[in-house]
């Protein structure tokens, strides 16, 4: 997809456009903010506004170029109060070196230096201007530029770079963060443009904790079943070995027989009566001899 105003190497490929369409990044909402009109392609009969995917890619590239200009990656702070963006911002921070704030934004993070969580970032990237309104407002107080994923009904107050996309679906949020991270790494020279990124886009998608628990339970059940099968197999082998070991070893039998033959019997030792009679002398004859 060729666009004017930038090098052709930064243009979106067919696969990028297909991914954006497959993740429903072009599906907006029924409401429309007046400052988002430039990013809307058309309005459907059911009232849903369709976002121009070409504009989405232009803003992804622009945002990536802004992020790449920050010397220290930790000075970039990514924020997501929306649960669908928690995993995406954490993965983005892990791959690009940014600082992530996933979950509730504590008021005063950017303005109150007394708090333990006080930060002085040079750039803020938000998932939703409505959900992350506190972070964007504080960024405006301390003159921090803001990049944000914006839907057709998102307010653009204090947002410097708006990336028009569907910021309510977990797939669209994950894909845009993944594309942004990939483009930043390409601009930094960390990865090559000629080869695909080895990180799957699924890693940026939100996952239900209950689904993770179910997978862990299924894995534990499979391990228990495999262990039970191994135990049963070992028991069967033990039965076969035990029955074979029940036969008497010929060498042991020969040794036992030889021992029995060599033993002396009490009966063979002699009769007590006979021996006593042979040793006893006549008392009367002895007395006469004396």
Swiss-Prot record:
Keywords for the protein's UniProt record, in alphabetical order: Cytoplasm, Ribonucleoprotein, Ribosomal protein
Any one GO molecular-function label of the UniProt entry: structural constituent of ribosome
Pfam families (alphabetical): 40S_SA_C, Ribosomal_S2
Region: Disordered, residue numbers: 257-290
Record's compositionally biased regions (Polar residues): 272-290
Cellular localization per UniProt: Cytoplasm
Homology family: Belongs to the universal ribosomal protein uS2 family.
Function: Required for the assembly and/or stability of the 40S ribosomal subunit. Required for the processing of the 20S rRNA-precursor to mature 18S rRNA in a late step of the maturation of 40S ribosomal subunits.
Subunit structure: Component of the small ribosomal subunit. Mature ribosomes consist of a small (40S) and a large (60S) subunit. The 40S subunit contains about 33 different proteins and 1 molecule of RNA (18S). The 60S subunit contains about 49 different proteins and 3 molecules of RNA (25S, 5.8S and 5S). Interacts with rps21.
PANTHER family reported in the protein's UniProt record: 40S RIBOSOMAL PROTEIN SA
Name of the protein described by the UniProt record: Small ribosomal subunit protein uS2A
Taxonomy of the source species: Eukaryota, Fungi, Dikarya, Ascomycota, Taphrinomycotina
